[in-house]
Amino acid sequence: MAEKKQWHETLHDQFGQYFAVDNVLYHEKTDHQDLIIFENAAFGRVMALDGVVQTTERDEFIYHEMMTHVPLLAHGHAKHVLIIGGGDGAMLREVTRHKNVESITMVEIDAGVVSFCRQYLPNHNADSYDDPRFKLVIDDGVNFVNQTSQTFDVIISDCTDPIGPGESLFTSAFYEGCKRCLNPSGIFVAQNGVCFLQQEEAIDSHRKLSHYFSDVGFYQAAIPTYYGGIMTFAWATDNDALRHLSTEIIQARFLASGLKCRYYNPAIHTAAFALPQYLQDALASQPS
């Protein structure tokens, strides 16, 4: 039997992961980054940008459920949602499940990602691009949040790692812009890497976000695709109570929403904010 081709992730120099490639569906350099979508027997369709896995069909539901339902149910009455990035459409898919949301704006820098994912990752977007509440804006996220006249109740930064096009979405200019267009008691969340291996990302985000928000923290989820353990999500708001809502309150909102999830549930919601001691210590050691 012929040996299968292997695709190796290039995020880390000294260690990493590989995927056997059963079939390359698409591989091109877009206007902004190198994009590949291939099939793997264990994880289904896999998308990578600039040598880093972004999503797989097998476990994407964990990431997208936690990035959407945690802030939306914590907020409780979000009407207007902004997604930065998210070109594969799965974040949009999860937001559209909240029937009380009135408008969903997605800002994606790379139109190529959107068009190719609509074709090759249909299970991710599940026709959510056709939702009448949805508006797509092709623009740089930093530019959008600093220029828009719109305001939002929840902002979800579905960014890549802080390299290439995603680097600007970890800057003070971006965080300041998000604060600018976030409504009172609004919530900002962002992908923040695997903290055991990328601890400096969390420390840097915490320091920068603390300049603009009174309550800054993190929550976590175990996502197999993201090598190294537990994925960390940044959380920022000026309503300190929202991070500490009881499981009972979240349970009532969850039941009222009618959501059916595969990973997220109210107990997971509240437990996700419990951080390992090494991360607590690292954050506490930083100058205020």
Curated annotation (Swiss-Prot):
Database matches in Gene3D superfamilies = Spermidine synthase, tetramerisation domain, Vaccinia Virus protein VP39
Q: Which residues form the PABS domain?
A: 9-238
Q: Which InterPro entries match?
A: PABS (IPR030374), PABS_CS (IPR030373), SAM-dependent_MTases_sf (IPR029063), Spermi_synthase (IPR001045), Spermidine_synt_N (IPR035246), Spermidine_synt_N_sf (IPR037163)
- Molecular function terms, GO-annotated: spermidine synthase activity
Q: What's its catalytic activity?
A: S-adenosyl 3-(methylsulfanyl)propylamine + putrescine = S-methyl-5'-thioadenosine + spermidine + H(+)
The places in or outside the cell where this protein is found are: Cytoplasm
Q: In which pathway does it act?
A: Amine and polyamine biosynthesis; spermidine biosynthesis; spermidine from putrescine: step 1/1
Per UniProt, S-methyl-5'-thioadenosine binds at Q33, E108, D140, G141, P165
Q: Name one GO cellular component term.
A: cytosol
Active site residues of this protein: D158 (proton acceptor)
| UniProt keyword terms in alphabetical order | Cytoplasm, Polyamine biosynthesis, Spermidine biosynthesis, Transferase
Enzyme class comes to transferase
Q: What is its EC number?
A: 2.5.1.16
Q: Which domain of life, per UniProt?
A: Bacteria
Q: Where does spermidine bind?
A: H64, D88, D158, C159, T160, D161
SUPFAM superfamilies on file: S-adenosyl-L-methionine-dependent methyltransferases (SSF53335)
Main location group: cytoplasm
**One Pfam family per UniProt:** Spermine_synt_N
Query: Which terms under GO biological process does the entry name?
Result: spermidine biosynthetic process
Q: What NCBIfam families does UniProt report for this protein, alphabetically?
A: MFS_SpdSyn, PRK00811.1, speE
Biological function: Catalyzes the irreversible transfer of a propylamine group from the amino donor S-adenosylmethioninamine (decarboxy-AdoMet) to putrescine (1,4-diaminobutane) to yield spermidine.
Q: Which family is this sequence assigned to? A: Belongs to the spermidine/spermine synthase family.
The name this protein carries in UniProt is Polyamine aminopropyltransferase
- Identify the species of origin: Shigella boydii serotype 4 (strain Sb227)
- Name the encoding gene, please: speE
